[in-house]
């Protein structure tokens, strides 16, 4: 079997609240780390989320 092209990643909040989203990305086309602006319900604002490893 071939290795899957999509991998699961964890998007950690940069606000320091500990909130995160789990999503997937194509490892072949998106080789750099992903950063996305999403809603953080702990601080009730849109903040930047950066990619981290799923432990």
From Swiss-Prot:
GO MF terms, alphabetically ordered:
structural constituent of ribosome
Q: Mind naming one GO cellular-component term on file for this protein?
A: cytosolic large ribosomal subunit
Gene Ontology BP, a term = translation
Q: Which residues form a coiled coil?
A: none
Q: Which InterPro entries match?
A: Ribosomal_bL33 (IPR001705), Ribosomal_bL33_CS (IPR018264), Ribosomal_bL33_sf (IPR038584), Ribosomal_zn-bd (IPR011332)
Q: Which Gene3D superfamilies match?
A: Ribosomal protein L33 (2.20.28.120)
Q: Which keywords has UniProt assigned to this entry?
A: Ribonucleoprotein, Ribosomal protein
Q: Which SUPFAM superfamilies match?
A: Zn-binding ribosomal proteins (SSF57829)
The UniProt entry's sequence similarity note says: Belongs to the bacterial ribosomal protein bL33 family.
Supply the name of the protein: Large ribosomal subunit protein bL33
Q: Which organism is it from?
A: Ruegeria pomeroyi (strain ATCC 700808 / DSM 15171 / DSS-3) (Silicibacter pomeroyi)
């Amino acid at each position: 079997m071939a290795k899957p092209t999509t991998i699961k990643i964890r998007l950690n909040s940069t606000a320091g609240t500990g909130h995160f989203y789990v999503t997937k990305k194509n490892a072949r086309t998106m080789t750099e780390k992903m950063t996305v602006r999403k809603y953080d319900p702990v601080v009730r604002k849109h903040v930047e989320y950066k990619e981290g490893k799923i432990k």
